[in-house]
């Protein structure tokens, strides 16, 4: 959530940001917000004046009663009327506060100066040129769907029978390979990169979604259990960030770095017309997430660290990839700056997003009220929050299967995963 003081002082900058994000239609909300804010200020001032008058007259009434000289009846009637007026103002003030908060919750984050201005994904900049590794794929390639079916390690049809399209089933050595990926990534982040592992809940309340910015703007993308009023998490970012919701963090503990595995659930509303085959777009997938809480002056250095940590996984797996710096028209509403890491699919002949690494500055912390004090007597400040996929396994699995396939139709397991799988190859004989 944006700081309303920033909007008051620099409304033109916020309007420019909306235009750069291709959200010019949201511009009237800024004027509406400022009008409501002025109305609120006037109401607060009037209410405070009346409360001061009530306090003053209440003392006069007490003096009259104490002295026994004169009558306080008329003053009491006047103050009853004043109290009723104050109560009405407080009710109106509550409604105004709700309107203001609704607008603030719907506004996107500001943008970092380094974010390129652009209209769509076509305007994203290549931050790191494609990183390649030597593969000898000089034979007719199978895509991940064909490999999964022929080796009996993936079953999308039975997943659809159980739950509907978009819910894959991993079988036998496919399940072992998926588990190996998750364990390898967690071990890298905790043992090499210094993150603390967390195993979070897979369901959260609405306040948690609100804290990280998925609610109310992206309410149509999350699965809701109506009876218990809980939501399936779209990413571990939600429960992990909200671990510290409403807390005052000790500056000595910053930065805080967490790594977490979770299943992720997304309705993918509006995906009609997009490529939804196999792992390309699913409703349930596995992901290892990195989340950081930092001091404001350290957050952009932390963003580069998160990106490098995600890249380290792909380098170890020898998966070809590239890094994009997202433009203003493609970056998520919550982020001030974001890198996308894309893996190469040799069968599809295109790049697939496998990780997003974002800095939210104080946008989430303000919504979730996560603060710290730089010194014991200092004014509390909001922390900066960051997150990055480290990584999502679904599209990573696409690239892995397709790059590590052989002419005979088997899959060689990447060397760094063999310690976890306890096998080197997946062949037609897989169970």
UniProtKB/Swiss-Prot annotation:
One of its GO terms (cellular component) is cytoplasm. GO terms for molecular function: ATP binding; serine-tRNA ligase activity. It comes from the Bacteria. CDD domains: SerRS_core. Its EC number is 6.1.1.11. The keyword Protein biosynthesis applies. Its main location: cytoplasm. Pfam families: Seryl_tRNA_N (PF02403), tRNA-synt_2b (PF00587). It is found in: Cytoplasm. L-serine binds at residues 235-237, 289, 389. InterPro entries: aa-tRNA-synt_IIb, aa-tRNA-synth_II, aa-tRNA-synth_II/BPL/LPL, Ser-tRNA-ligase_type_1, Ser-tRNA-synth_1_N, SerRS_1_N_sf, SerRS_core, tRNA-bd_arm. It catalyses: tRNA(Ser) + L-serine + ATP = L-seryl-tRNA(Ser) + AMP + diphosphate + H(+); tRNA(Sec) + L-serine + ATP = L-seryl-tRNA(Sec) + AMP + diphosphate + H(+). ATP binds at residues 266-268, 282, 353-356. GO terms for biological process: selenocysteine biosynthetic process; seryl-tRNA aminoacylation. Catalyzes the attachment of serine to tRNA(Ser). Is also able to aminoacylate tRNA(Sec) with serine, to form the misacylated tRNA L-seryl-tRNA(Sec), which will be further converted into selenocysteinyl-tRNA(Sec). Belongs to the class-II aminoacyl-tRNA synthetase family. Type-1 seryl-tRNA synthetase subfamily. Homodimer. The tRNA molecule binds across the dimer. Consists of two distinct domains, a catalytic core and a N-terminal extension that is involved in tRNA binding. PANTHER family: SERINE--TRNA LIGASE, SERYL-TRNA SYNTHETASE. This is Serine--tRNA ligase. It comes from Pelodictyon phaeoclathratiforme (strain DSM 5477 / BU-1). The gene is serS.
